[in-house]
């Protein structure tokens, strides 16, 4: 759960999704090496105006933030689509996509990032995009055997 008051923050959150996706590839590589079953996860991202409320009990140290709004439920719904029915792990709503894609294109001018995403129509929870984006340097390190110098 991240608060994104600025458009640049939405890009940074998407970037974290790309790292999580790459991390899961590393973790599953380790599992395969030890003949363990792989883990499939869905990574959901949604952006919307939310209400954040602090809830707890006075004097007992319980003081948590609670997010109220569509972004949380949609992110959960999108995560449920990830790595299922032929979808890749990363699933993000159109608002998230629209607020980060220009920066992704700017940071990858020769790589056509818009082609990394597939658009899906969903009347229920809202349209979304799917992708299997990884951090290349991190992935190369995984493929090279995860050696620490």
For each predicted feature, which ranges?
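Short acidic/His/Gly/Ser-rich catalytic and metal-binding motifs that mark active-site loops
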Residues: 1-2, 51-56
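A general secondary-structure junction signal
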Residues: 3, 43-49, 94-96
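A short glycine-enriched loop-to-beta-strand structural element that forms part of the catalytic core
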Residues: 34-53
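Intrinsically disordered, glycine/charged-rich C-terminal tails and inter-domain linkers
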Residues: 84-149
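Conserved, well-folded catalytic cores of nucleic-acid-processing
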Residues: 23, 27, 78-81, 85
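Short helix/loop segment flanking the catalytic signature motif in cyclic-nucleotide metabolism enzymes
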Residues: 1-33, 37-39
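Charged, alpha-helix-enriched surfaces in structured cytosolic catalytic cores
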Residues: 15, 40, 66-73, 91
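Catalytic-core segments of nucleotide cyclases and related cyclic-nucleotide turnover enzymes
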Residues: 35, 54-80
């Amino acid at each position: 759960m991240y608060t994104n008051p600025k458009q640049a923050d939405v890009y940074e959150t998407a970037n974290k999704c790309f790292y999580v996706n790459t991390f899961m590839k590393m973790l599953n590589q380790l599992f395969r090496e030890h003949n363990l079953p792989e883990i499939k996860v869905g990574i959901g991202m949604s952006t919307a105006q939310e209400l954040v409320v602090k809830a707890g009990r006075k004097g007992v140290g319980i003081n948590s933030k609670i997010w109220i709004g569509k972004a949380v439920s949609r992110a959960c719904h999108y995560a449920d689509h990830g790595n299922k029915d032929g979808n890749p792990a990363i699933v993000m709503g159109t608002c998230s996509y629209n607020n980060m894609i220009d920066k992704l294109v700017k940071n990858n001018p020769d790589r056509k990032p818009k082609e990394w995403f597939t658009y899906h129509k969903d009347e229920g929870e809202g349209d979304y995009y799917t992708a299997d984006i990884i951090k290349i340097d991190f992935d190369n390190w995984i493929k090279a055997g995860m050696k620490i110098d």
